[in-house]
């Protein structure tokens, strides 16, 4: 077959296939045009998942009669000069959206420029353009797309259900609305109830308001403001505290110079920043806004402009990691401690409570009377778990695995100056797992296992980066039996385990010999530790960087080397744990993202008893 020139109509349809993949693609292109036109209010309406009808109305600058005639021609644009290709500052710039859409659908445009006495309208049906005629419209532009892809029936076969396509449109509009909180958006259609996002105030508060409206009130409550800047590149935005996560990565939003984009390298930076806070199966919720010189980023990588290429991707990644880690560390204590007093009050409120119906004699058996005892006691028991390791020397003697915890019944917990410390003074332990501490203005509840797990984890990391992890040699190597596949996984990573002081070697089929363990873990159960490590290694991606693999190893070791639930602690031990928490970075959350402590203010306690 000889080479021949394709007809213009076919060329347009090929271009449409690249730019307009589905109704959501058309909505994206049209809304971006409305934003570029300076619109302060943009209304979107759809029918049939956008397949039957899409209507976009804005109050932007509009077009003159001459501009309207060119707008439906290929590669005609008002957003690009000869020398601007490397300095793209607008969302749409190729001049492809309108002609591409009109080549596969019915397109009607009505627009009015401030300099025109009235509006102008044009219709395009599968590439066939009508004459431009006068019309009625306030300043701005109204674009209506009907029967999308009717001129390319093959494309219709690949569209999903109306509900699925409508959801894709909603996600596109959500992202654009997050990028521009200064613009009011309305999304309506037969598939959904109308949603309106009012224009927000400029700055971080307005941005958080818009993000909260879209991502939910939980995000607004748990949001941490983050930011970092270097060499002309700035990263700003909000990230949810580790206590608010998702089962997938769909809650991670990235915007570059106001453009919603997807970038695997940058989102990998988000995972790295949260690695010390979240388990492997949970994902953070973030909205990050990167601003840099347009010459430093290529927005022309993808026909739909959903991907970008950075000239210095390493710098952008480093700034994102720094911004997130700094924000998480800075707000760690606040996000862990600030339990909503109103929520606690509601949880404890009893309907129908009456003062007459609650006499002192009605205390349940075992109820505690503050008049008869100066401090809350716990029953004397033998410590059944391994010793707690990692405290300072002043409290180390208290952790003797073979000795029972002392009976402190009736002993007053020493207060001294500890009441003024962030985590206060330990008063008692409840349910053999939670420490109750008193502060000057309330009380603190600490999960002893979660708190010590974070302390051990941070110490393991610090040891690795300094002089190496201290080891303890076993007098008699411990032989651990497991399936051959698990043994192979462990032996394949033996050099990595060695970095953390865990020395293993083969002991025949289906067994390994443990010769050394990290000193920080004390008398940890080596068999249980190795089995957990083998299970976690089975889930590792082979491409996972060595640093991340080592962090996973440290997290698993920390869990096994921590004070266990059910271990009775003396007051000295509890206070030692509180002081260690205050000196440990990221101690507000355990390695799995759960809070290590919560705080209840005195004002909230008084509300529980009707004193406020």
Curated annotation (Swiss-Prot):
GO CC terms: mismatch repair complex
Keywords: DNA damage, DNA repair
One GO BP: mismatch repair
Pfam families per record: DNA_mis_repair, HATPase_c_3, MutL_C
Source organism superkingdom: Bacteria
GO molecular function annotations of the record: ATP binding; ATP hydrolysis activity; ATP-dependent DNA damage sensor activity; mismatched DNA binding
Family assignment from sequence similarity: Belongs to the DNA mismatch repair MutL/HexB family.
Function: This protein is involved in the repair of mismatches in DNA. It is required for dam-dependent methyl-directed DNA mismatch repair. May act as a 'molecular matchmaker', a protein that promotes the formation of a stable complex between two or more DNA-binding proteins in an ATP-dependent manner without itself being part of a final effector complex.
Record protein name field: DNA mismatch repair protein MutL
Organism from which the protein derives: Afipia carboxidovorans (strain ATCC 49405 / DSM 1227 / KCTC 32145 / OM5)
Upper taxonomic lineage: Bacteria, Pseudomonadati, Pseudomonadota, Alphaproteobacteria, Hyphomicrobiales
């Amino acid at each position: 077959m000889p080479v021949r020139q394709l007809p213009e109509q076919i060329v347009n349809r090929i271009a449409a296939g690249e730019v307009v993949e589905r109704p959501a693609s058309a909505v994206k292109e049209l809304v971006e045009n409305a934003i570029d036109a300076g619109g302060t209010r943009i209304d979107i309406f759809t029918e049939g998942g956008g397949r039957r009808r899409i209507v976009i109305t804005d109050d932007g600058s509009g077009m003159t009669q001459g501009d309207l005639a060119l707008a439906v021609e290929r590669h005609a644009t008002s957003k690009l000069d000869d020398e601007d290709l490397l300095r793209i500052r607008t969302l749409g710039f190729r001049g492809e959206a309108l002609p591409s859409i009109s080549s596969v659908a019915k397109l009607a445009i009505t627009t009015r420029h401030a300099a025109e006495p009235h509006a102008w309208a044009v219709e395009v049906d599968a590439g066939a353009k009508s004459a431009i005629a006068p019309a009625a419209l306030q300043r701005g532009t109204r674009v209506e797309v009907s029967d999308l892809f009717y001129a390319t029936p093959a494309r219709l076969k690949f569209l999903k259900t109306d509900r699925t396509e409508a959801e894709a449109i909603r996600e596109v509009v959500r992202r654009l609305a997050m990028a521009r909180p200064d613009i009011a958006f309305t999304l309506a259609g037969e598939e959904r109830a109308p949603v309106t996002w009012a224009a927000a105030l400029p700055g971080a508060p307005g941005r958080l308001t818009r993000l909260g409206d879209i991502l939910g009130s939980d995000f607004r409550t748990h949001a941490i403001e983050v930011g970092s800047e270097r060499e002309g590149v700035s990263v700003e935005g909000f990230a949810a505290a580790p206590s608010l996560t998702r089962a997938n990565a769909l809650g991670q939003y990235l915007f570059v110079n106001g453009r919603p984009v997807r970038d695997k390298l940058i989102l990998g930076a988000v995972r790295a920043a949260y690695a010390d806070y979240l388990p492997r199966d949970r994902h953070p919720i973030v909205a990050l806004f990167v601003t840099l010189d347009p010459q430093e980023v290529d927005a022309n990588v993808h026909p739909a402009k959903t991907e970008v290429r950075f000239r210095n991707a390493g710098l952008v990644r480093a700034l994102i990691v720094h911004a997130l880690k700094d924000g998480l560390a800075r707000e760690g204590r606040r996000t862990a401690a600030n339990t909503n007093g109103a929520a606690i009050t509601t949880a404890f409120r009893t309907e129908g409570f009456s003062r007459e119906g609650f006499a002192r004699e009605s205390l349940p058996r075992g109820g505690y009377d503050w008049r008869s005892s100066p401090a809350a006691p716990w029953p004397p028991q033998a410590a059944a778990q391994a010793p707690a390791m990692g405290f300072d020397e002043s409290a180390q003697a208290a952790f003797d695995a073979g000795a029972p915890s002392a009976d402190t019944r009736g002993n007053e917990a020493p207060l001294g100056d500890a009441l003024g410390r962030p985590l206060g003074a330990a008063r008692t332990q409840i349910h053999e797992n939670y420490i109750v501490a008193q502060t000057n203005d309330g009380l603190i509840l600490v999960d002893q296992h979660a708190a010590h797990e974070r302390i051990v984890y941070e110490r393991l990391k610090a040891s690795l980066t300094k002089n190496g992890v201290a080891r303890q040699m076993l007098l008699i190597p411990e032989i651990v039996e497991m399936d051959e596949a698990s043994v192979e996984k462990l032996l394949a990573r033996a050099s990595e385990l060695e970095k953390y002081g865990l020395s293993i070697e083969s002991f025949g089929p289906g067994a390994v010999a443990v010769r050394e363990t990290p000193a920080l873990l004390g008398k940890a159960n080596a068999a249980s530790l190795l089995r957990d490590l083998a299970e976690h290694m089975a889930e590792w991606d082979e491409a996972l960087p060595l640093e991340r693999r080592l962090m996973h190893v440290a997290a698993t070791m920390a869990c096994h080397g921590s004070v266990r639930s059910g271990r009775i602690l003396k007051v000295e031990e509890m206070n030692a744990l509180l002081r260690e928490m205050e000196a440990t970075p990221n101690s507000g959350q355990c390695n799995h993202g759960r809070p290590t402590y919560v705080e209840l203010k005195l004002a909230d306690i008084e509300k529980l008893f009707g004193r406020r």
